[in-house]
A protein has these predicted regions:
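N-terminal prosegments of processed precursors
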Residues: 1-124
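Short, hydrophobic/proline-enriched secondary-structure or compact coil segments at domain edges
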Residues: 95-100, 271-278, 308-313
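Residue-level detector of short, conserved catalytic/binding motifs and their immediate flanks
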Residues: 45, 74, 95, 174, ...
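Active-site-adjacent bridging/hinge elements
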Residues: 177, 304-311
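An amphipathic alpha-helix/helix-turn recognition signal
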Residues: 71, 92, 200, 328-329
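Short pre-active-site segment immediately N-terminal to the catalytic Zn-binding motif
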Residues: 310-333
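Fold-level signature of zinc-dependent metallopeptidase catalytic domains
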Residues: 3-5, 121-302
Length: 333
């Protein structure tokens, strides 16, 4: 899927496979050169990207990350434009990426579907018509915890003195446990592809922390499958994962479907747990939701707040049957 030699550019449009128009998005089949990315590791190195319009962009190397499953991530930036990053994760069976275009232009996306890589381009004009509350919400995607959380749940164990990443010294490493639904993995083609996708999303998060100079690094300690439906409300799923009934504002037993995941939080000493599932519109109600400890001006009390170290994230695209339009959850959402 990324076996082109280094011919001086990251990708080439694949021959013999037609592009596909899906709503506001054009999917173009491409062939990738992982060799080009490997040759672009190191200060002063660049990845050259040639778009389907023939225009070239050059991205300067910022950092790279190697993952336990053998996948790895390259991060570069348009010269002189902080926040305009290209982030590409190469795995054994999949490649995922986000390619900055500068200014207000929407990022291009690299994704893997049906065993091959695709470049996804958004039509900015059509994209403006796709604003919908679950993918571009006006309300916050953070939830405030109920008061007086039960104690004794797996807790926050933020680490001091984490490893150093380029551009900022990390002072806190947050260990993350990821539970992914079977639908999420099947939609990508399998467990290997799901793991590559998870690694990519974590590195998108890490780059956001670097850009914001928070001194925080996210680290995956384990990823595992969970047997839970995708086409349900993210808010209800967060309640079921946490052990909360938000409608009645009471604590309840967590859904048994998450028993193994919650136990793994203790086993792997995870600070935070997220459930990653395939985006379903409009059933998910959003692209994700999490508890906001300390929200509303309340004090942060680790012994209490550890109970709320959970989040739910939707990933991918789906057609909303109510308007027959295709919606995406952004990598950085």
């Amino acid at each position: 899927h990324a076996g082109l030699p280094d011919n001086g550019t990251l990708l080439a449009v694949a021959k013999g496979v037609r592009s596909q128009k899906r709503g506001a998005y054009l999917w173009s089949p491409v062939e990738l050169s992982e060799a080009h990315a490997l040759d672009a590791i190191g200060p002063g190195q660049h990845i050259v990207f040639t778009g389907t319009d023939g225009l070239q962009h050059s991205f300067e190397y910022q950092r790279h990350a190697e993952h336990e499953d053998g996948s790895w991530t390259w991060v570069g930036r348009l010269p002189g434009e902080p926040g305009q990053e290209t982030i590409i994760t190469f795995g054994d069976r999949a490649v995922f990426g986000s390619i900055a275009q500068g200014g207000d232009a929407p990022n291009l996306r690299l994704t893997t579907r049906d065993g091959r890589p695709w470049l996804v381009e958004a039509d900015a004009g059509e994209l403006a018509t796709l604003a919908k509350w679950f993918t571009d919400p006006e309300e916050s995607d953070a939830r405030l915890p109920l008061p007086h959380a039960p104690r004794g749940a797996a807790g926050m164990r933020a680490k001091a003195g984490g490893q150093i990443l380029p551009e900022a010294q990390t002072s806190t490493t947050i260990d993350v446990l990821v539970g992914f639904t079977s639908g999420f993995a099947q939609g990508l083609g399998g467990t290997s592809q799901a793991q590559t996708r998870i690694n990519h999303l974590i590195e998108v998060g890490n780059q956001a922390h670097l850009n914001a100079e928070t001194g925080v690094q996210l680290r995956i300690v384990h990823a595992m499958s969970v047997n839970y439906a995708d086409a349900t409300s993210n808010n209800k799923t967060l309640d079921a994962l946490t052990g909360v009934d938000s409608d009645r504002k009471v604590y309840v037993d967590p859904d048994p479907a998450f028993a193994d995941l919650r136990a793994a939080r203790e086993t792997y000493k995870a600070d935070l747990v997220t459930v990653l599932r395939k985006f379903n519109a409009p059933e998910n109600d959003s692209c994700g939701v999490a508890w906001l400890n300390g929200g509303g001006g309340t004090a942060i009390i680790p012994e209490d707040d550890e109970f709320y170290g959970y989040s739910v994230v939707s990933d991918g695209s789906d057609v909303d049957e109510s308007d027959d339009k295709t919606y995406f959850c952004r990598d950085e959402a």
